[in-house]
């Protein structure tokens, strides 16, 4: 394997940290029509204790008016919570994001209220993965694959008419 000295790692980290700080504080567009918010659980080594701990990495992914995706921010905390999400939303607002039309979130308690505190006009939508998971709570294990396939026909439909037809088929099944 490749041997890398601790000094080299420190120099590379120091060089990258300045760029990361600049990226994290950069100005944002005033409007992102869609912003997807999610938190991921990752293992991170604590710099002081050197102990590896599970942490939540909060992610805000904006979709621009022309459909481009842009990571708006990454934040790290001990675990996911609506209170910390509010601080993330405040950071986005302080960096120039004035309006969001639709947010896509998981079902975290208090998250929708945090969004409305920062962006009162934003519509809040539960992400499709969480919607499907919620629906599957009411389905037997043996029926779950068929239900997922039927739901996929609805949410992946190319037109409203196709989605309505798939929904009608689902209701009749």
Sequence positions of predicted segments:
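RNase H-like nuclease fold core
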Residues: 2-6, 11, 15-105, 109, ...
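Extended amphipathic alpha-helical interaction segments
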Residues: 113-173
């Amino acid at each position: 394997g490749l041997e890398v000295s601790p000094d080299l790692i420190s120099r590379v980290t120091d060089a990258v940290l300045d760029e990361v700080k600049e990226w994290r504080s950069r100005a944002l567009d005033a409007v992102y029509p869609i912003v997807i918010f999610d938190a991921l659980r990752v293992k991170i080594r604590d710099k002081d204790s050197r102990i590896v701990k599970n942490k939540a990495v909060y992610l805000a992914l904006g979709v621009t008016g022309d459909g481009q995706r842009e990571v708006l921010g990454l934040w790290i905390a001990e675990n996911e919570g609506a209170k910390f999400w509010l601080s993330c939303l405040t950071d986005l607002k302080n960096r120039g994001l004035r309006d969001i039309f639709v947010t896509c979130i998981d079902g975290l308690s208090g998250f929708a209220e945090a969004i409305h505190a920062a962006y009162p006009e934003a519509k809040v939508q539960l992400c499709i993965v969480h919607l499907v998971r919620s629906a599957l709570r009411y389905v037997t294990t043996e029926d779950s694959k068929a239900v997922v396939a039927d739901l996929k026909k609805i949410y992946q439909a190319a037109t409203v008419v196709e989605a309505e037809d798939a929904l009608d088929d689902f209701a009749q099944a």
